[in-house]
Each structure stands twice: as C-alpha cells, then as structure tokens.
Amino acid sequence: MPAFSQATDLSAWKELQEHHTAVGRNIVLKEAFEKDPQRFEKFSRTFKNTVDNSDILFDFSKNFLTEETLSLLVKLAKEANVEELRDAMFKGEHINFTEDRAVYHAALRNVSNEPMQVDGKSVVEDVNSVLEHMKEFSEQVRSGEWKGYTDKKIDTIINIGIGGSDLGPVMVTEALKPYGAPGMKLHFVSNIDGTHIAEALKDSNPETTLFLIASKTFTTAETTTNANSAKKWFLETAKDESHIAKHFVALSTNEAEVTKFGIDKKNMFGFESWVGGRYSVWSAIGLSVALYIGYDNFHQFLAGAQAMDKHFREAPLEQNIPAIGGLLSVWYSDFFGAQTHLVAPFDQYLHRFPAYLQQLSMESNGKAITRSGEYVKYTTGPILFGEPATNAQHSFFQLLHQGTKLIPSDFIMAAESHNPVEGGKHQRMLASNFLAQSEALMVGKTPEQVKTEGAPDNLVPHKTFLGNRPTTSILAQKITPSTLGALIAYYEHLTFTEGAVWNINSFDQWGVELGKVLAKKIQQELETSGAGAGHDASTSGLLAAFKQKANLA
C-alpha cells in the first residue's frame, strides 16, 4: 500500500503548485504551437492495437502541457507509487482493502492465458471455463439449436440488471451494433419503474424471448423485482414452470437463489468476487454482448482490452497513454480548479459511452477519504458528462466556448464509418467538426477578428471567444470490437491513475448503500397506514403527499 497519506504531502505536488503559478496558468496554447512546430509530435501518443493491426492516436498537445509539466506529473506518479499499485493490481493483490478483495477484471480478458493468481490460486482455468460456457451457449442460441418451449428460435434477448450489470452491456451492444445478429432484438431493463419492463415486454413474444437475469447475488431489489415480473408475464402464456429453463438464464454466483427462481443451474454463468460491477462487462455479465455480436467478436473485444492492459503495464510513464490521461485529469482538477470532464464521441454508435464512463469514473473516484482514513485536502473525482457530437455542439458546447467554467474535454472519432453514406460525405462533415471544435476551443476569436468581420461595436464582446480551452483528441481507425475494448481499458486505467495519485480506494462504492437501506424502510411505510416515523419534516411531508396522490393514505 502507498506509504503516504495526502497527495499534497508529496514533493512533486509542491513543485507542481510552483510550476502552475509560474508557467501552467500562463500557458497560451495558440502561442505554444506558434513557438514549437513540433508540439503535436511531442505530446501525441499512438497506441498500436496488435489485435487488428490498427492504431489509435491520442493527441494530448492541446492541453496545458510543457515538457516540464509532463516531467513533474510523471514525478508525481512515481512518488505516489502509481506503478507499484498498478503492479499489485495485476498480481491479484487485495488492493480493494475496504472489502479485502483483489481487483482483477484484467484476468477476465487474459486471452493469451498468462499466469494470473489470486491468493495463490490460478484463476485462468475458471475464467476460461466460463468463457467456454458463454461461447457454447451463445452459438447455440444464435444458430437456432437452442429453442424456446414451442421449438421456435430465440429472436429477443431481454437483459435484466442494474448498474454495471446494465450500463456495460447496453453501451457495448449499441457501440457494436454493426456486428449484431440480423433480426435479433435486444432490450435492457434496469429501472424499478414499471414502465421499463412493461415497454420491453410489450415488444416481445414469450415463445421466442430469452431473459438474462444479471445479478451477482441474485438479491438486488430492482433486478429481482423485474425478474419476477418477467417470470409472471412468461408463465401467463407458457403455464408450465418447467419451461422457465429454456427462457431464463442467470448471470450470478448464488446457486441457491437461482435454482429457487426456477433456472437450471446448468444455465448459470458465474463470476468471482474480485470482479467489480463497473468492470463486469468483461465477465459473464457480457453474455448479452456475446449473444448479439457473436463469440468471436466478443473475444476480439476482450483482446483489445488486454492489448491496452499490456501497454499500461509496460510503457514508461512518459509514454504511458492511460497514465498521461489520468495525470492530466489530476492537473486540471487540483491545480486549475476544474470540476468537470467532458467526453464527446463523434460517433452515433458510441452514444451511451459517456453514460458508461460516468459510472466508471464517478463511482470509482467519488471518494473523500484517503487510504489512511483521512479526509482529503484536495479535489478528487471530476463530474463526467457527455453526449455524442455533433448533437452536443447544438446544446452545451456554448458553455465550453464562452462560459466561465474550465471544462477539459475528450473528443473521440473513428476515421472509417460503418455507414459511409453518400460516398463518405457524412463522415467527412463529421470529421470537419471533430477537427474544428478542438481548434476553435483553443484559438478562440479576438475582438479584432470580430470587428474585421463587420460586427457592430456593441456586439463585439458577445462574439469574442477567449479560446485556450484544453482538449484531448482520440482518433481511431474504426470502431471495431478490439478498438472498443482498448478504449474502455484506456479509461479504466486513466481512472486508476487518478485514484492512485489521490490515494483513495477506487474500487469500493459505499456511497451506493445508504440510500438503499433507507429505501427499504420507506417502502415498508408505503405498504402500511400512517405517515412513518423518524424522518425529517421534508421527507415526512413528501411521504404523506405521495400517499395521498397515489391513493395510499
């Protein structure tokens, strides 16, 4: 474990504060490029994806960086023992110390079968056994060998889960839609709001629908409630409970609850306690992905992530792409006072990517207590948000360009589209915006330029853009399964780097629990008469108002 309590105690942190005062806050990006024609080459990095022999370019040059800045950030990472914590994670050590667990999602994508152990026991065999089960099952369903209770082919998959059991599979199946099985319908149900399950069932036929119940414990309230509603809907048509075995499978480790529900234990896909929910798309939770895009493509997805793992483990920090991304985030959060981080994919298939990254980033680093149990003396996890562009340009980009907040931004694009409409015309228009936005945010527009364009004096300040807004541009060849895997792993390791420097535990989520506990108490009060007890006046008033409006009073 790191031998420091507060990141502010590290000498590199103090040096960065001095550097920020003397240099960092005075960097004018436009001038930096004018002074150094090699700036792009110096501060961009290329990830070589050995899986499909493509490259992903990460351009960090439009960030508040000098060679000294990067050197000091690397020094900070070394003093914070980022490399040691990284190596401990990849060795299967219990770096999630509040839950006494390993953090070993990398083992799920160990397609090269490198030795990987937890507590002295190899995990490779068990991981491969689950993957083999996923392969066999997904191929049976996709081929039509697996049939419903009336011998019809499955054509609809409904994944019921919440949090990591939902966000990952939703995002990945949307991102890889071009690889999806023709004619297969996918629904993801997460919300306890009955509308979510009702809308999915409305579009489904019990004879051809397969339900994936995704819950490690099989006790998550939202998931089990939705699963029981789905079972009731199914049995209204199927009648015989023995038919459940052909239409329900469990992504869980709780065999007792799974079999009690009526699912055959042979149709149970397990995973280990060292798989955190927000990292679980690589595990059996990714079964919906394998069913939709096929197991071979799912394997490519895993392989792309492993390729980024290898880079993160082996590249020196100065060249380490996820480490640089994470260190820049610390630089902006703690030295420039940035509170947010924008991720804008210039790719409609990636429209759920920001929502996925929200959980990854904010559940991991939304912490205020260091590993030594002290309250942090600095800012931790930024608020991550985003929408696909160019849509986002017509909504919140106004604030990026002319607002008062510093919002470091990531723009993501692929050179090749899966849909080269009109000979690639749409893609070229998209690319022009991808390139123009980062340039515009950097260079801005001076009052003199506005005047030259003929604007009246009273409008000049309104049409002036200060510029000097930092961005990172990420340019892939094409959004393939392996490219997507690498991109997700990039953000995982970026998030890891942030948390390691801040000396917080990025792998628990106690903040999720308190609301759940209180909700159980209030749910009981909603089922009984009276106004409930022990609440503040606001909660009591709201409870009474809800009961009245819902005719429960």
From Swiss-Prot:
GO cellular component: cytosol; mitochondrion
CDD domains: SIS_PGI_1, SIS_PGI_2
Enzyme Commission number, as recorded: 5.3.1.9
Primary localization: cytoplasm
Keyword Chloroplast on entry: no
Entry keyword Isomerase: yes
Job description of the protein: In the cytoplasm, catalyzes the conversion of glucose-6-phosphate to fructose-6-phosphate, the second step in glycolysis, and the reverse reaction during gluconeogenesis.
Full protein name: Glucose-6-phosphate isomerase
Provenance organism: Aspergillus oryzae (strain ATCC 42149 / RIB 40) (Yellow koji mold)
Lineage: Eukaryota, Fungi, Dikarya, Ascomycota, Pezizomycotina
